[in-house]
Swiss-Prot record:
Sequence ranges assigned to domain NTR in this UniProt record: 30-156
InterPro entries on file: Netrin_domain (IPR001134), TIMP (IPR001820), TIMP-like_OB-fold (IPR008993), TIMP_C (IPR027465), TIMP_CS (IPR030490)
SS bond list: 30-102, 32-131, 42-156, 158-205, 163-168, 176-197
Record region (Involved in metalloproteinase-binding): 30-33, 99-100
Tissue: Expressed in brain, heart, ovary and skeletal muscle.
Keywords: Disulfide bond, Metal-binding, Metalloenzyme inhibitor, Metalloprotease inhibitor, Protease inhibitor, Secreted, Signal, Zinc
Site (Involved in metalloproteinase-binding): 69
Name of the protein: Metalloproteinase inhibitor 4
SUPFAM superfamilies cross-referenced by the UniProt entry: TIMP-like
Membrane-spanning residues: none
Claim: Coiled coil is one of the keywords in the record: no
Signal peptide segment: 1-29
Underlying gene: Timp4
Protein backbone atom coordinates (compact mmCIF):
# COMPACT_ATOMS: atom_id res chain seq x y z
CA UNK A 1 0.00 0.00 0.00
CA UNK A 2 1.53 3.39 -0.97
CA UNK A 3 2.23 5.86 1.81
CA UNK A 4 -0.37 8.56 2.25
CA UNK A 5 -0.38 11.63 4.53
CA UNK A 6 -3.76 10.55 5.91
CA UNK A 7 -2.45 7.14 6.94
CA UNK A 8 0.63 8.65 8.56
CA UNK A 9 -1.53 11.18 10.36
CA UNK A 10 -3.67 8.36 11.77
CA UNK A 11 -0.70 6.58 13.33
CA UNK A 12 0.89 9.81 14.51
CA UNK A 13 -2.34 10.99 16.11
CA UNK A 14 -2.96 7.72 17.94
CA UNK A 15 0.59 7.51 19.29
CA UNK A 16 0.63 11.16 20.34
CA UNK A 17 -2.67 10.79 22.16
CA UNK A 18 -1.29 7.80 24.02
CA UNK A 19 1.88 9.73 24.84
CA UNK A 20 -0.15 12.58 26.31
CA UNK A 21 -1.56 10.18 28.90
CA UNK A 22 1.91 9.54 30.33
CA UNK A 23 3.74 12.86 30.81
CA UNK A 24 7.50 12.95 31.54
CA UNK A 25 8.41 11.80 35.03
CA UNK A 26 5.44 9.52 35.50
CA UNK A 27 7.45 6.40 34.74
CA UNK A 28 6.90 3.46 32.48
CA UNK A 29 3.59 2.25 33.86
CA UNK A 30 0.58 2.15 31.58
CA UNK A 31 -2.68 3.33 33.16
CA UNK A 32 -6.14 2.78 31.73
CA UNK A 33 -9.63 3.83 32.72
CA UNK A 34 -11.59 0.82 34.08
CA UNK A 35 -14.07 -0.80 31.73
CA UNK A 36 -16.26 -3.89 32.03
CA UNK A 37 -15.76 -6.49 29.24
CA UNK A 38 -19.19 -5.55 27.89
CA UNK A 39 -18.06 -1.92 27.60
CA UNK A 40 -14.90 -2.99 25.81
CA UNK A 41 -16.98 -4.94 23.31
CA UNK A 42 -19.38 -2.07 22.71
CA UNK A 43 -16.66 0.57 22.33
CA UNK A 44 -14.38 -1.48 20.06
CA UNK A 45 -14.56 -1.46 16.29
CA UNK A 46 -13.22 -5.00 16.09
CA UNK A 47 -13.51 -8.07 18.33
CA UNK A 48 -11.87 -11.33 17.24
CA UNK A 49 -10.51 -14.62 18.51
CA UNK A 50 -7.05 -15.33 17.13
CA UNK A 51 -3.68 -17.05 17.45
CA UNK A 52 -0.43 -15.12 17.10
CA UNK A 53 1.87 -16.49 14.40
CA UNK A 54 4.79 -14.05 14.49
CA UNK A 55 5.85 -10.52 15.39
CA UNK A 56 8.00 -7.86 13.72
CA UNK A 57 9.07 -4.33 14.68
CA UNK A 58 8.07 -1.91 11.92
CA UNK A 59 8.03 1.88 11.43
CA UNK A 60 4.78 3.59 12.35
CA UNK A 61 4.71 5.11 8.84
CA UNK A 62 6.89 5.51 5.75
CA UNK A 63 7.55 9.12 6.64
CA UNK A 64 11.34 9.36 7.27
CA UNK A 65 10.74 12.00 9.94
CA UNK A 66 8.56 9.64 11.98
CA UNK A 67 10.71 7.79 14.54
CA UNK A 68 7.86 5.89 16.21
CA UNK A 69 7.97 2.10 16.07
CA UNK A 70 5.18 -0.46 16.18
CA UNK A 71 5.01 -4.19 16.75
CA UNK A 72 3.20 -5.91 13.91
CA UNK A 73 1.68 -9.21 14.96
CA UNK A 74 0.78 -11.66 12.23
CA UNK A 75 -2.31 -13.50 13.38
CA UNK A 76 -4.51 -16.41 12.40
CA UNK A 77 -8.09 -15.27 12.83
CA UNK A 78 -10.31 -17.97 14.27
CA UNK A 79 -13.58 -16.09 14.67
CA UNK A 80 -14.84 -12.53 14.31
CA UNK A 81 -17.46 -11.28 16.78
CA UNK A 82 -17.59 -7.63 15.73
CA UNK A 83 -16.30 -5.60 12.79
CA UNK A 84 -17.83 -7.50 9.87
CA UNK A 85 -18.78 -4.29 8.07
CA UNK A 86 -15.23 -2.89 8.26
CA UNK A 87 -12.99 -5.92 7.83
CA UNK A 88 -13.18 -9.54 6.74
CA UNK A 89 -10.10 -11.62 7.47
CA UNK A 90 -7.52 -9.85 9.62
CA UNK A 91 -3.89 -10.79 8.90
CA UNK A 92 -2.05 -8.25 11.08
CA UNK A 93 -2.65 -6.23 14.23
CA UNK A 94 -0.40 -3.38 15.39
CA UNK A 95 0.54 -2.14 18.85
CA UNK A 96 3.00 0.50 20.15
CA UNK A 97 6.55 -0.77 20.55
CA UNK A 98 7.04 1.18 23.77
CA UNK A 99 5.48 -0.24 26.93
CA UNK A 100 5.02 3.33 28.18
CA UNK A 101 2.53 3.79 25.32
CA UNK A 102 0.62 0.66 26.37
CA UNK A 103 2.14 -1.70 23.85
CA UNK A 104 0.81 -5.25 24.13
CA UNK A 105 3.11 -8.26 24.46
CA UNK A 106 1.56 -11.45 23.06
CA UNK A 107 2.91 -14.98 22.84
CA UNK A 108 3.82 -16.07 19.32
CA UNK A 109 4.01 -19.54 17.79
CA UNK A 110 2.17 -21.20 20.64
CA UNK A 111 -1.15 -22.93 21.08
CA UNK A 112 -2.48 -19.97 23.05
CA UNK A 113 -5.49 -18.18 21.60
CA UNK A 114 -6.51 -14.62 22.46
CA UNK A 115 -9.60 -12.50 22.55
CA UNK A 116 -8.52 -9.25 20.88
CA UNK A 117 -10.48 -6.00 20.89
CA UNK A 118 -9.24 -2.94 19.07
CA UNK A 119 -9.80 -0.12 16.64
CA UNK A 120 -9.57 0.13 12.85
CA UNK A 121 -7.68 3.21 11.67
CA UNK A 122 -8.36 5.20 8.53
CA UNK A 123 -5.70 3.26 6.62
CA UNK A 124 -7.43 -0.03 7.47
CA UNK A 125 -4.88 -1.25 9.99
CA UNK A 126 -6.06 -2.80 13.27
CA UNK A 127 -4.59 -1.08 16.34
CA UNK A 128 -4.52 -2.66 19.83
CA UNK A 129 -3.05 -1.58 23.18
CA UNK A 130 -3.25 -2.49 26.84
CA UNK A 131 -6.32 -0.33 27.41
CA UNK A 132 -8.24 -2.68 25.13
CA UNK A 133 -9.66 -5.93 26.49
CA UNK A 134 -7.08 -8.54 25.49
CA UNK A 135 -7.23 -11.87 27.28
CA UNK A 136 -6.13 -15.46 26.70
CA UNK A 137 -9.19 -17.29 25.40
CA UNK A 138 -8.81 -20.02 28.02
CA UNK A 139 -9.18 -17.41 30.79
CA UNK A 140 -12.63 -16.30 29.65
CA UNK A 141 -15.66 -17.67 31.48
CA UNK A 142 -18.43 -19.53 29.69
CA UNK A 143 -20.73 -16.53 30.14
CA UNK A 144 -18.15 -14.22 28.55
CA UNK A 145 -17.65 -16.54 25.58
CA UNK A 146 -21.39 -16.88 25.00
CA UNK A 147 -21.98 -13.14 25.44
CA UNK A 148 -19.51 -12.32 22.68
CA UNK A 149 -21.95 -13.84 20.21
CA UNK A 150 -25.11 -12.00 21.25
CA UNK A 151 -25.65 -10.46 24.69
CA UNK A 152 -22.87 -7.86 24.69
CA UNK A 153 -23.85 -6.51 21.28
CA UNK A 154 -27.58 -6.55 22.00
CA UNK A 155 -27.14 -4.53 25.20
CA UNK A 156 -24.78 -1.75 24.17
CA UNK A 157 -27.58 0.67 25.02
CA UNK A 158 -26.95 -0.04 28.70
CA UNK A 159 -24.40 2.04 30.60
CA UNK A 160 -22.06 0.46 33.17
CA UNK A 161 -20.84 2.61 36.07
CA UNK A 162 -17.86 1.55 38.17
CA UNK A 163 -18.51 1.56 41.92
CA UNK A 164 -15.43 2.38 44.00
CA UNK A 165 -16.99 3.05 47.43
CA UNK A 166 -20.39 2.91 49.12
CA UNK A 167 -22.87 4.35 48.70
CA UNK A 168 -23.09 3.97 44.92
CA UNK A 169 -26.07 5.19 42.98
CA UNK A 170 -27.25 5.18 39.40
CA UNK A 171 -28.51 8.30 37.66
CA UNK A 172 -30.50 6.70 34.83
CA UNK A 173 -32.66 3.59 34.39
CA UNK A 174 -30.30 2.19 31.75
CA UNK A 175 -27.33 2.02 34.17
CA UNK A 176 -25.80 -0.97 35.96
CA UNK A 177 -23.39 -0.60 38.89
CA UNK A 178 -20.16 -2.54 38.48
CA UNK A 179 -18.98 -3.55 41.97
CA UNK A 180 -15.99 -5.87 41.38
CA UNK A 181 -13.48 -3.30 42.62
CA UNK A 182 -15.56 -2.55 45.70
CA UNK A 183 -16.08 -6.19 46.66
CA UNK A 184 -12.92 -7.90 45.45
CA UNK A 185 -10.41 -5.07 44.94
CA UNK A 186 -9.89 -6.15 41.35
CA UNK A 187 -11.57 -5.11 38.14
CA UNK A 188 -12.26 -8.39 36.41
CA UNK A 189 -13.86 -10.24 39.29
CA UNK A 190 -16.98 -12.36 39.53
CA UNK A 191 -19.33 -9.76 38.10
CA UNK A 192 -17.16 -9.06 35.05
CA UNK A 193 -16.71 -12.77 34.41
CA UNK A 194 -20.25 -13.99 34.91
CA UNK A 195 -22.75 -11.15 34.40
CA UNK A 196 -24.14 -9.07 31.56
CA UNK A 197 -25.90 -5.72 31.93
CA UNK A 198 -29.13 -6.42 30.02
CA UNK A 199 -32.03 -4.20 29.05
CA UNK A 200 -35.64 -5.16 29.86
CA UNK A 201 -38.57 -4.42 27.58
CA UNK A 202 -39.34 -1.39 29.77
CA UNK A 203 -35.89 0.08 29.07
CA UNK A 204 -34.45 -0.63 32.53
CA UNK A 205 -31.03 -2.31 32.61
CA UNK A 206 -29.89 -4.75 35.30
CA UNK A 207 -27.33 -7.50 35.77
CA UNK A 208 -28.11 -11.01 34.57
CA UNK A 209 -26.20 -14.26 34.46
CA UNK A 210 -27.86 -16.14 31.68
CA UNK A 211 -31.46 -16.35 32.92
CA UNK A 212 -30.52 -15.63 36.54
CA UNK A 213 -30.80 -12.20 38.13
CA UNK A 214 -27.85 -10.66 39.96
CA UNK A 215 -27.12 -12.33 43.28
CA UNK A 216 -28.71 -10.57 46.27
CA UNK A 217 -25.44 -9.64 47.98
CA UNK A 218 -24.50 -7.40 45.04
CA UNK A 219 -27.79 -5.56 45.35
CA UNK A 220 -27.59 -5.16 49.14
CA UNK A 221 -24.10 -3.69 49.26
CA UNK A 222 -24.78 -0.83 46.84
CA UNK A 223 -27.76 0.50 48.72
CA UNK A 224 -27.10 3.79 50.60
Amino acid sequence: MPWSPLAALSWALVLRLLALLWPPGRGEACSCAPAHPQQHFCHSALVIRAKISSEKVVPASKDPADTQKLIRYEIKQIKMFKGFEKAKDIQYVYTPFDSSLCGVKLETNSHKQYLLTGQILSDGKVFIHLCNYIEPWEDLSLVQRESLNHHYHQNCGCQITTCYAVPCTISAPNECLWTDWLLERKLYGYQAQHYVCMKHVDGICSWYRGHLHLRKEYVDIIQP
